[in-house]
Amino acid sequence: MEWLNVLESQGQALLGPTAWLVVWTIIKIVIIAVPIILCVAYLTYWERKMIGWMHVRLGPNRVGFKGLLQPFADVFKLLTKEVVVPSQANKILFIVAPVVTLMPALAAWAVVPFGPEAVLANVNAGLLYVMAITSIGVYGVIVAGWASNSKYAFLGALRASAQMVSYELAISFVLVTVLLVSGSLNMNEIVLGQGRGWFAERGLTFLSWNWLPLLPLFVIYVISAVAETNRHPFDVVEGESEIVAGHMVEYSGMAFALFFLGEYANMILLSAMASIMFLGGWMSPIDIAPLNWIPGWIWLGIKTFFVVSLFIWFRASFPRYRYDQIMRLGWKIFIPLTGVWLVVVAIWMQTPWNIWR
């Protein structure tokens, strides 16, 4: 990273230390935010393509080569539509709610490491920051349901808040277990900790990642992430056959699109977190020269893409759960299981067979 040191020294000489710090932080935010927004846009394209292939259809194939410009067509369509605010709605909160849903999903990327040194803010409490910032998103859903002054929207918001809080608990127990085996809240340290051990010393890095010893927690995390993002088969929040579009029923135009941007941004974020917590983050699966030449951010992207594709596969394969079934799964199965596994791992770490030393 010699060129970064040269750029930093030249920037400080030109603008001064304080001004350069502000400018450099803004540049890093743009470098992270723009690709994330593009990934969100093209995730909608990949979802339609993948479901189309699973249903033996073509999917989007008209706008641009193989339909690659379809996300831009969708954006232009939504930009030209009017944002209709209901006459009885709380207008300020009605407009603020979609923004509150999207912003935490983007702000959480500040501590996500794309490589050993490629991170916007390498803070020691990175995992705690992600858990805290992502929990704010539920407020946008609640505010949208209340501000719309609609029965359908309010019912959807009530469902959403209960479901998201329930599965946040399961995810929190999973992340606490990862914290226990890693011994650090720093995201970089969590990734580096998965590169140590008997298998890693012999080049089989993928067998030293947390997915193998914590496999039940990995499965619970992925399913809970699907429920946390209100994705099918846990999308009773916006169950079309029951409450139309849930908390989004009164929204249109770009305000409506912001909710979907937030949903897909959360999908990518939780998939990236799964890659960092369980799949070795930016590390290559096998410690050999050709694979080690590939930049870490590409490995992180490949693993994140794999987990995101699981979200889409679930949508195309499983029927929607009833609301009572979703809550029973979260409170009576996942939360007790994660709590028990946390105790099991804690005991395991005190035995001579501790593999995380």
Swiss-Prot record:
Transmembrane segments in this chain: where? Answer: 20-40, 92-112, 127-147, 165-185, 206-226, 268-288, 294-314, 329-349
Q: Which UniProt keywords apply?
A: Cell inner membrane, Cell membrane, Membrane, NAD, Quinone, Translocase, Transmembrane, Transmembrane helix, Ubiquinone
* Predominant location category: membrane
Q: How does it sit in the membrane?
A: Multi-pass membrane protein
Give Gene Ontology CC terms.
Answer: plasma membrane
List the Pfam families: NADHdh
Which GO BP terms apply? aerobic respiration
Question: One MF term in GO for this entry?
Answer: oxidoreductase activity, acting on NAD(P)H, quinone or similar compound as acceptor
Any coiled-coil ranges, and where? none
EC number per UniProt: 7.1.1.-
Q: Where in the cell is it found?
A: Cell inner membrane
Q: For this protein, what reaction is catalysed?
A: a quinone + NADH + 5 H(+)(in) = a quinol + NAD(+) + 4 H(+)(out)
Q: Does the keyword Transmembrane apply?
A: yes
Keyword flag Transmembrane helix? yes
Which family is annotated? Belongs to the complex I subunit 1 family.
PANTHER family in the record, alphabetically?
NADH DEHYDROGENASE SUBUNIT 1, NADH-UBIQUINONE OXIDOREDUCTASE CHAIN 1
Could you give the subunit structure recorded for this chain? NDH-1 is composed of 14 different subunits. Subunits NuoA, H, J, K, L, M, N constitute the membrane sector of the complex.
Q: What does this protein do?
A: NDH-1 shuttles electrons from NADH, via FMN and iron-sulfur (Fe-S) centers, to quinones in the respiratory chain. The immediate electron acceptor for the enzyme in this species is believed to be ubiquinone. Couples the redox reaction to proton translocation (for every two electrons transferred, four hydrogen ions are translocated across the cytoplasmic membrane), and thus conserves the redox energy in a proton gradient. This subunit may bind ubiquinone.
The molecule here is called: NADH-quinone oxidoreductase subunit H
Native source species: Bordetella avium (strain 197N)
The organism's taxonomic lineage, starting at the top = Bacteria, Pseudomonadati, Pseudomonadota, Betaproteobacteria, Burkholderiales
Its gene is nuoH
